[in-house]
Amino acid sequence: MKIQHIYQRIKTTFSILLIFTLLAITLILTSIFLLDYIKPDDLLAVDNKETLIVNNINVVLVNTNQILKNRQLVIDKGIITAINETNLASSSKARIIDGKGAYVTPGLFDMHVHLYDRKYLMLNLAYGVTSVRNLNGKKMHLRWKKELQNGEWLGSNIYVSSPILAGAGTHALNQQVVSPQEGRSQVRKAQSNGYELIKMYGYLSADIYEAIIDEAKKVNISVAKHGPHPAKGADWSSLKGLQSLEHVEDVFQGPLNYQFDHNKLRLIAQKIKALNVPIVPTLETFKHLTQLSNDKESFINTLDLDYLNPLHFDIESHFTVSRWLVDNSQQSAYHVKKLQFLLEIVKVLNDHQVKLLVGSDAGTMYTLPGIATHHEMQLLKQSGLSNFEVLKAATINAAQTLAIDQRYGSVSVGKVADLILVTKNPLDDIGHLETPFAVIKNGQWLDEAKLKALKSSAKDNESYFWSVINLVEDLLTRAAF
């Protein structure tokens, strides 16, 4: 009788657990289905139908290092239709704005970010970063891109890579690839699912690495590679034709083998120059690491962490940031020395006329969207680039890399009106771009009040629940990917 009673209790407990499990699965699957329909209710609206005339502005030419002074800018349906020498155009139907002598540059591109929240795109826009390239694509990013293209809300343009293709032993948030055949399959699936480029890590074996590049050429999709060096066993020539190479830190960790070798660095720079492939240094993320290592909690206290997605904040706290907070003084000093050498690597690459791009790695280690882009630009300047060279890296170089320079990347008639207006000349100090008094997004005028509203809304990010649902969607999608 006693055994029968125990058996009955076990059976009842199991039934309850089964019911709760089924309910949880139903809730998760239903929530995933609803992701296509659920959006925050405080996203700013797109409103760019009016013709815009901006008088009394100075146009910065990113191709020639010149300024066209005292111009009038005419924008219609999001396109620059005229740049007049005087205030010629006038219309009762147009919105006329006095530019008050502002300097106008193209909107900035951040070519290496990690997006974990729609609000990151709003925060980027508030800082004049009108386009970003997200290098760890998920289904949610394709969803956000479609929403932006449909004009459902106001945010930066987004270019979305595939999920990161990585070798055996990678963590669950990457797509593991263990054979050349699987590499080819992942490329085809990424292309058919709407991703715009392939992102692959550098420690893939040479045969997988070469298979991915070969298949990408066949289906006409670009490839960005982690680390400006070939995979082990592959030739430098295998890197030709890639869209970009990421992280100068990997020059130090890869071909330099952790040696502060200036002579060998110059030889490597010659090899990189011969590739004709742009480099994205991502200095800001290493500087952030260095500050975490040296100043620890006192540095964290200076950051406005309310801008970070709550789930992403927890993941970064436990799996990334925590490792640098336990560094001893010797390790901290090493990071300072290494950071200075990374600046030297960028200088040598620039001296060898390697095309450089601005990419902050924003989203890693508490780096904040938007402001991280400007920090990256300042670090490029510290590396020896002129203000003009930094501006080129953040605008026309990026547009050329993405093959969209016929529509973006300069202030020119016929191009999309994604622009920044600042009160002081950015060719005198690139830091002036950090505080725009206005941004124009696809022809929509965003004054200081609107930019402030974007920043304010960006703090009200996605809930923990919906962030988890997005994560589960990604894991399930890639399990079937």
Please give the residue ranges for each predicted region.
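Acidic, glycine-enriched loop/beta-strand segments at the rims
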Residues: 41-44, 59-72, 85, 386-391, ...
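Histidine-rich, glycine-flanked metal-binding segment
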Residues: 34-51, 59, 63-105
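Divalent-metal coordination cores built from histidine and acidic residues
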Residues: 35-40, 99, 103-104, 121-229, ...
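N-terminal Sec-pathway targeting helices
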Residues: 2-25
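Structural recognition of alpha->loop->beta junctions
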Residues: 194, 233-257, 376-390
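Active-site neighborhoods of metal-dependent hydrolases
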Residues: 195-197, 256-383, 475-481
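Divalent metal-coordination and catalytic microenvironments
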Residues: 57, 73, 78, 101, ...
